[in-house]
Design a protein with these regions (language model features):
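Bacterial N-terminal signal peptides
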Residues: 8-17
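Generic hydrophobic/packing signal
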Residues: 14, 115, 133-137, 154, ...
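Short glycine/threonine-rich turn/loop motifs
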Residues: 22-135, 197-249
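Second-shell loop/turn segments in exported
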Residues: 46-49, 66, 138-139, 148-151, ...
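Generic hydrophobic, aliphatic-rich segments that mediate packing or membrane embedding
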Residues: 73-76, 107, 125, 146, ...
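Accessory helical subdomains and C-terminal extensions of nucleic-acid helicases
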Residues: 142-143
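C-terminal capping alpha-helices of c-type cytochrome domains
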Residues: 147-194
């Protein structure tokens, strides 16, 4: 009985040590956790020049789901970055204004955790979310709405005007940049902390045995060389390095 109890204690201690070792292995491999603590998360995603507030987030959410910011009045941000479909569109190539397929055969990247991206769009041409939000709204194959049209429509809706005043003050100028920046503020809140992040933060019980084995293999096989950082976002990598890209229609 004493031997069995001692063995159980030994195995438990060994298991805890292995988990702690795996946490260290993961973090030293470059994997980073999304903070589950709201204060730590806000410190990471907030902008002192345009602080996140409840009013801005709620207003940005309405704009995100509003098709009136597209030329046709049919397409919203959520049309392509569907929050119920992983923040993406789930099709081989995005479909935009006039049922136009993306000319570069690209689908929509997820909006979830995009606040952690060092650059936006597949090619990284945009430095941050507020800048990125301006692109699809105006792009011909996407929402096809000139900035002036978006401004006219939003300013013609009294409820929106009042909400902008509530979010930014009574003297706010509701222009295109302010509209898209407000959408970006909502997008900043679309983060998905998980049990994987809890594990990286030091909770060795957050993952089960099979998940830990998978993480260990993920690191040992070199997957973490590219898929690293926070939310496994990785870094910008050269395209077609191994082989020529072939479109699968």
């Amino acid at each position: 009985m004493k031997l069995s109890k001692s063995l159980a204690i030994f195995l438990l201690g060994a298991s805890t040590m292995l988990a702690s070792t795996l946490i260290e292995k993961a973090t030293t491999s470059g994997l980073k956790a999304i903070p589950s603590d709201e204060a730590k998360l806000m410190k990471m995603i907030d902008d002192k020049n345009d602080p996140i507030t409840k009013e801005k987030v709620e207003l940005g959410k309405k704009l995100y789901f509003d098709p009136r910011i597209s030329k046709s009045g049919l397409i919203s941000c959520n049309t392509c970055h569907n929050l119920g479909l992983g923040g993406a569109d789930g099709v081989p190539a995005a479909i935009g204004h006039g049922w136009t397929m993306n000319p570069h055969h690209l689908n929509s990247p997820t909006v979830y955790n995009s606040v952690f991206f060092k650059a936006q769009f597949w090619d990284g041409r945009s430095p941050h979310l507020a800048d990125q939000a301006q692109g699809p709204v105006q792009a011909g194959p996407e929402m096809a709405a000139p900035a002036s049209l978006v401004e006219q429509r939003i300013n013609s809706i009294p409820e929106y005007v009042e909400e902008f005043k509530g979010a930014y003050g009574k003297d706010v100028k509701v222009d295109f940049a302010k509209i898209t920046a407000t959408i970006a503020t909502f997008e900043k809140t679309l983060v998905t902390p998980s049990k994987f992040d809890k594990f990286l933060s030091g909770n060795d019980k957050a993952l089960n045995k099979e998940e830990k084995e998978g993480l260990n293999t993920f690191i040992d096989k070199g997957c973490a060389s590219c898929h690293t950082g926070i939310a496994l976002g990785g870094t910008m990598q050269p395209f077609e390095l191994a082989a020529k890209y072939k479109l699968q229609a």
